[in-house]
Structures are given as C-alpha cells and as structure tokens.
Amino acid sequence: MNFRRRLCTAALIAALPLASQAQNNTLLLNSVLAPQNPMTKMIVKPWAEKIAQVTEGRVKVDVAPSSLAAPQQQLASVNKGVFDIAYQFHGLLTDQVKLNQIAQLPFVNTTARGSSVALWRTYQKHFAKANELGEVQVLALFVQPPGVMFGMKGPIDGMDKLKGRKVYALPGVPSAMMESAGAAVVAAPGARSYEIVSGKTVDAFVGYPTSDAEGLKTLSYATDVTDIPGNLTAVSWVLFMNKKRWAALSEKDRKAIESISGEAFAQGMKQYDDLETKVRSEAAAKGIKFHMANDAFVKELQTLATPITQAWLKDASSRGVNGQEALDFYRAQAAANR
C-alpha cells in the first residue's frame, strides 16, 4: 500500500472505536479542493457521510484532511490505490477523456443542476460505452454554475479588453477561448488561481463561477463580472472509485451507494445554484459590478467557439459516438432541467 495512504488511513483508523472498525468497510476519499471550498462542504463531504446511512453502517467513507495528490493526479492515484475515491476536473483530463468535455463547450450550459443532469444522462446514453476513464467505477458527473469573466481593472466588454492582456484561465475551453481572443494566457488549476490573481500579474481571470471565486478567495480582486448570454463555459467534474474496491462491496451496498450517486448527485447540484445567487447578491452589495455582454461581443465569442465545438465533434466521432446527436441531447436536457 502506498506510504502516504497507509499513514493517513492509520491516523483515521486510530480515532475509530474498535467495534466500529470491525463493522465498517472504510473507504478513503481524497478531496482535491480545500475543506472550506463549497464543493467540499456542500456536495462531496455530505455525499460521503450519507454512504454510512444508506448502507446501514456497513460502508464508511473518510475524507482525507488534505489532498494526497496533485489535481492532475487524482485518476492515476485512484488506479494505483493511493486512495479509494476521488473527483477530478475534466479540464485536467483532456488527453484521455474527450467525450465528457461536452460540458465545458461554449454556449451549451444553463445551471449547475441542469447541466449536471444533462451530463449524467448524456454519459449514460452516449458516452459510457466508450469507457474513456478505464478501470474505475464512475459514480457521478457534475457541473458547476457557468463560468464568467472577472475584470480586475474594469469590465471585460469587448475583444479589445482581451487582446494583448494577461488573463488567468482554467485549462481546457476557457484557456483555448482566451488564447483565440489574443490574450496572454496563464492556465492552471483553480486551486492555483489565488496565487496568480493575488499577485496581480494578470488583468482578468476567466472560467469559474462567482461562488468559486469567493471560495478560492479571488473574488475580492475583481472590480467587474461579465456574464455571457448562453454561457461561455462551465467547470465539470467526474467522481470515481477504484474498481477493485467497488467490486469488493456487496451488491446491496453498491446499489445503496448508486441510489445517492449518478442522477441523485446531479439533482443535488441545485445547492450550488442557490449559493451562486447568494454570493452574487453579496458581491454586488460590496460594489462589484455585474454586466451582460452585448450582442456584438457575444457574436465574436461565438465565432471563436465554432472551431472548439467542431474539434469536439471530431473527437466524439473518433470514439464511435454521434457527436451532434449527443450535443443536441445535452442541450435539451440542460434546458429542461435548469
């Protein structure tokens, strides 16, 4: 067993009563985001805690107190048995996972709940057979509220505010869009955005929602927030478990865990929509200005988006998937469940 996992597991088990150790099949979940991050507090940790309830105490999930692996190493670490369960940002899986990138495409998303339901249903209907994630059990797919543009020196209200400017962007679609717009892009996982934004070496940051900016402590550096009609992109994730550990659970316990995962997990993302509304209201009260991009700016962004969407359709075809059919289905589901 990996040394770091052995050390963490030993510490966790030491705190458990002996009777509990005997009764529980204890799994270790790694949260790549900090304990105070909304994703951890509202979504991942409550789900982990609920597993003990739905399995009547037969399965327990402990959440590591801090991440045991780099953001880009979550999938590999679960495969190696460093920990049993993890979740990873799709933008850090672009080489291996092409199909699930649908949720990060420009102009396809609605709300966190709508997009999460759409992604799960699209995966089940169109993508699962491709098995892009390999030897893990996919437990949930989820999408955060749409990402926006944060201006640090005034609003981003046109291409002239991007061209030649230094912009932090999440890897994947956000960074690709900003590069196409002529920005000098600094791409890194969201967990690193604070050090980049707080250092004031960029003029703007793009890709995640206002609620995440609050959680990542970057919102206070923004003067303006620009929303894009139809939404520029969204941050999407996959939650997975080591296949051998999953197979070792009883069928009854697997079904119990599935009952709070998948579609149920996606529906629960409404909490993130509610948080987004609250944080935006509080930010406006503190003086941050919110803007809706004008038609001319949106049209220019849509032009930049076309080759990104076309590239995804080509990737889908290479995986044996009718990309246009999947994309139409995703959009319809996102709109119907917003």
Curated annotation (Swiss-Prot):
Induction or repression: Induced by TSA. Transcriptionally regulated by TsaQ and TsaR.
Stretch forming the signal peptide: 1-22
Gene Ontology CC, one term: pore complex
Gene3D superfamilies documented for this protein: Bacterial extracellular solute-binding protein, family 7
Entry keyword Ion transport: yes
Subcellular location(s) of the protein: Cell outer membrane
Source superkingdom: Bacteria
One biological process term in Gene Ontology: monoatomic ion transport
GO terms, molecular function: porin activity
Keywords of this entry: Cell outer membrane, Ion transport, Membrane, Plasmid, Porin, Signal, Transmembrane, Transport
InterPro entries: DctP_fam (IPR018389), TRAP_DctP_sf (IPR038404)
PANTHER family hit by this protein: BLL6794 PROTEIN, PTHR33376
Quaternary context: Part of a two-component transport system composed of TsaT and TsaS.
Job description of the protein: Involved in the uptake of p-toluenesulphonate (TSA). Forms a large, general diffusion pore with a preference for anions.
Identification of the protein by name: Outer membrane transporter protein TsaT
Origin species: Comamonas testosteroni (Pseudomonas testosteroni)
Gene field: tsaT
